[in-house]
Amino acid sequence: MSDIEARVKKIIAEQLGVAEGEVTNEKAFVADLGADSLDTVELVMALEDEFSIEIPDEEAEKITTVQLAIDYAKSHAKA
């Protein structure tokens, strides 16, 4: 697991209040991890802070799974 992947999973676990072991790449935030729309907004903000990136709303709407969050962070991370 890459450093970015581990950091993304840690943020997701913290933001959604689930165990890190439950945060696997194929999990969807809403369907599998119980997130609501506010949770997803807060999750995107946490990812932006952690990786010093800006995620436009139209992109944020597409980040619906753990793997998509990891992929986005890997391709846009500055830190």
Swiss-Prot record:
Residues 2-77 form the Carrier domain. The modification O-(pantetheine 4'-phosphoryl)serine is found at residue 37. One of its GO terms (cellular component) is cytosol. Pathway: Lipid metabolism; fatty acid biosynthesis. The keyword Lipid metabolism applies. It is found in: Cytoplasm. The keyword Phosphoprotein applies. Pfam families: PP-binding (PF00550). One of its GO terms (biological process) is lipid A biosynthetic process. Belongs to the acyl carrier protein (ACP) family. Carrier of the growing fatty acid chain in fatty acid biosynthesis. This is Acyl carrier protein. It comes from Methylibium petroleiphilum (strain ATCC BAA-1232 / LMG 22953 / PM1). The lineage of its organism: Bacteria, Pseudomonadati, Pseudomonadota, Betaproteobacteria, Burkholderiales.
